[in-house]
Amino acid sequence: MTYKATILAIFMIILVLGIGTKETRGQETCHDLIMKRDCDEATCVNMCQQKWKGSGGSCFQNFNVMSCICNFPCQV
């Protein structure tokens, strides 16, 4: 009886670890450049939240132009 219980316990551990690995997969960060000039922080955040359903955005300097980039979890 203990042999079957040990095999079952090992199987359950592998199953739980496999499920945990599947949930973390696909959580890479994707980026989208929305505005290519004249970035305003509040507008950038609003546009990113509307387009990507709650994901934030930020302004960054792209050469001599302020651009808006959105960061969001990639969908696989």
UniProtKB/Swiss-Prot annotation:
The keyword Secreted applies. The keyword Disulfide bond applies. One of its GO terms (biological process) is killing of cells of another organism. It is found in: Secreted. Keywords: Antimicrobial, Disulfide bond, Fungicide, Plant defense, Secreted, Signal. InterPro entries: DEFL. It holds the Pfam family SLR1-BP. Its main location: secreted. Residues 1-26 form the signal peptide. One of its GO terms (cellular component) is extracellular region. Disulfide bonds join 30-74, 39-59, 44-68, 48-70. Belongs to the DEFL family. This is Putative defensin-like protein 121. The gene is LCR55.
